[in-house]
């Protein structure tokens, strides 16, 4: 059975660090998930826009990694819009260094997930519920989450220092 692909959207150094952390961590918690991230999953020499567009058309789950630095980036809005047009897709904003009140439309339309333990666990349960026959039982999912959470927490903490630009002014 093919793995369920999750598109990880990012823009900027900190957002990239968050997406990289999720890409590494997600398959440890839900083994039937295959995260897709442009930085790692587009072959050298490939037409990157064609590859990204193809992925955006074929995935059912996407995580948009938002930080104070990339809230107003057009690329984030493009990817979120493309993901949301797919029938039965789920688009989750993952807020690193942000509160839900910091996010404005159109991204505010998606129920945001704070990059903390409680909210990340809820996100994992949501992703698991979308796996159509491949989902883990709740007890097993919770055990995997608890086992691997510290790794993600460390990587998210390290990502806090990964921003090379000032946040955009509103």
Name these PLM-found stretches:
Residues 2, 68-86:
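Conserved TIR/SEFIR loop-to-helix hotspot centered on a Trp-containing motif
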Residues 41, 68-69, 94-100:
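Short beta-alpha junction loops
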């Amino acid at each position: 059975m093919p793995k369920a692909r999750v598109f990880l959207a990012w823009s900027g150094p900190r957002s990239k660090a968050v997406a990289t952390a999720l890409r590494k961590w997600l398959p440890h918690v839900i083994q039937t998930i295959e995260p897709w991230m442009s930085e790692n999953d587009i072959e050298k020499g490939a037409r990157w826009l064609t590859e990204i567009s193809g992925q955006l058309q074929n995935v059912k789950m996407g995580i948009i990694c938002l930080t104070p630095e990339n809230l107003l980036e057009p690329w984030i809005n493009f990817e979120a819009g493309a993901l949301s047009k797919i029938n039965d897709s789920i688009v989750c904003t993952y807020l690193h260094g942000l509160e839900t009140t910091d996010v404005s439309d159109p991204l505010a339309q998606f129920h945001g997930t704070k990059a903390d333990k409680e909210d990340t666990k809820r996100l994992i349960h949501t992703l698991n519920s979308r796996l159509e026959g491949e989902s883990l039982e709740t007890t097993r999912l919770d055990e995997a989450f608890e086992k691997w959470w510290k790794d993600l927490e460390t990587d998210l903490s390290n990502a806090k220092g990964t921003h090379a630009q000032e946040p955009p002014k509103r």
